[in-house]
Amino acid sequence: MTANITKSPRPLKITIVGDGMVGKTCMLITYTRNEFPEEYIPTVFDNHACNIAVDDRDYNLTLWDTAGQEDYERLRPLSYPSTNCFLLCYSISSRTSFENVKSKWWPEIRHFSAHVPVVLVGTKLDLRIPNSEKFVTTQEGKKMRKEIHAFNLVECSAKKKQNLQQVFEEAVRAVERKPKTTSKQSCKIL
């Protein structure tokens, strides 16, 4: 006789960081409630939850929305413990937010959570105008992903509901990734 055992969803904590007004909260609300918030309300801290299936496994995501404003620099790191993955966000329409990925956010999350995987997220994809120097290009995003050793880059639009599912699937995959074996030779002590 075999028992039919159903695995319960694996809980994961995903913490979202980035400059204020890059669209972190809109991304979370649109993803979890399937509605785009038209009004901007600055976030101090907020939590959202949802279930997701990735690669034939169920997960329960707790999504921690953090404040990007400098006023909350001392409070924000209190949300970092037990994080399984960071979504490091910048707005495709803001070069300053993109530059802050490397100068502010990457150093901050590495200081508090050195080995937690990161998915780099370019928000407000719907605003990009091709061949405009004002906007961050996909190539620049890919280069930044390599420089900060992020698991992946996903560009999305909360307003158009474009690539939102992929953002959270990649966060789960970043947590579940297996270390790559570079050599099959064993260590020998002589």
UniProtKB/Swiss-Prot annotation:
Positions where lipid (S-geranylgeranyl cysteine) attaches: C187
Effect of gene knockout: Hemocyte precursor cells start to differentiate normally, but never develop into mature hemocytes.
Motif placement: Effector region: 40-48
GO biological process entries: actin filament organization; border follicle cell migration; cell chemotaxis; cell projection assembly; cortical cytoskeleton organization; establishment or maintenance of cell polarity; hemocyte development; hemocyte migration
Sequence positions that bind GTP: 18-25, 65-69, 123-126
Compartments (UniProt record): Cell membrane
Entries under SUPFAM superfamilies matching the protein: P-loop containing nucleoside triphosphate hydrolases
Tissue note: Highly expressed in the embryonic cephalic mesoderm starting from stage 6 and fading by stage 11. Hemocyte precursor cells.
Record PROSITE patterns: RHO
Keywords assigned: Cell membrane, GTP-binding, Lipoprotein, Membrane, Methylation, Nucleotide-binding, Prenylation
GO cellular component: cell projection; cytoplasmic vesicle; cytoskeleton; plasma membrane
Residues found modified as Cysteine methyl ester: C187
Pfam families xrefs: Ras
Prodomain residues: 188-190
Gene Ontology molecular function, alphabetical: GTP binding; GTPase activity; protein kinase binding
Protein's job: Essential for the maturation of hemocytes.
Sequence similarity: Belongs to the small GTPase superfamily. Rho family.
Protein name (database record): Ras-like GTP-binding protein RhoL
Species annotation: Drosophila melanogaster
Name of the gene encoding the protein in the UniProt record: RhoL
